Amino acid sequence: TGLIASSFAGCAKVNYVTEGAIKAIHQIKDGSWKKQAEGEKAGSSEDTSVLEKSFEAGKYGGVEFKSLEDVANYYKEAYDYTKTLTAEYVNDKGQTETFYKLLGDEKINVGKVMIDGKENAVINKLVPGIVDGLFKPNIYGLVPCNNRNPKLDNYNCNEKDPGKKDFRKSYVKGEDVLDANITDNGDGTITMVIQPKAAEMSMRGEDSQGDFFEVLGDISATVAQIDVISFAQGTAEDNIKVTYKGGTVTCTINTKTKEITKAEYDMVAEVAVNHANVAVIKDKSASLLIKYKNTFPASDEVTMKARQFKRK
């Protein structure tokens, strides 16, 4: 389970799992690691479309889309415009705060835990409970996002020193998109479903997956600092691999204003750790599948429960 902990350690938004997964080592008897049922091997490395229908050039909602690059450009324009919009919210102390108009929540699902290429029923049952118990969902603007306050939505969360990335602007490019489809909703809006190309060890705003999703970032650097984990050979950087593949972005856009009114970001990542030593477990490999979802807009009920504020 420390292997599972290492899978999450680099992500600021899901690092609550690290502590819980390390604790779970003490809940599993050593023998349970040996009683491994046969499971399916890790998925194909091929990057193929998961969309129900592939891209078809044409006019949707009065907008011409000739290529996937047109889809990417339109999405970027809509994202950029939507992130210029703010709204006033009131917190549980009665104070007014200004955040993005479009805010969303987050959910995470962890499954398909495999040890040495085989699924382990004990761990597969244990992990979701740990995750659910520890998960403290936050509220964000359109992802990737570092803060719901637009002034702080940058690499450093600092208005005066934003650092290398400003997440009020999308970094999406035509070459990021593997496939997409568009539906004219007949009410002045279109719905785009976009599948970014697969990527490994993604960073926010720096590759096909990091341009669209709230990715995990540099896991290996953090794992290297976890005392209970060591490696039988090589370093954390050598032995940890995160592959993002098969995730989709679904967004509804008002074609008159280019405002995104509704969106769902479904990120899928496989985390693999090799040659790991955790307590009495020596030189093991482990992998797990993370499904991370951001849903927009978040209701007042959700924002109050998660972060004690609601729309004014």
Positions of predicted regions on the chain:
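Sec-dependent N-terminal signal peptides of Gram-positive bacterial secreted proteins and lipoproteins
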Residues: 1-15
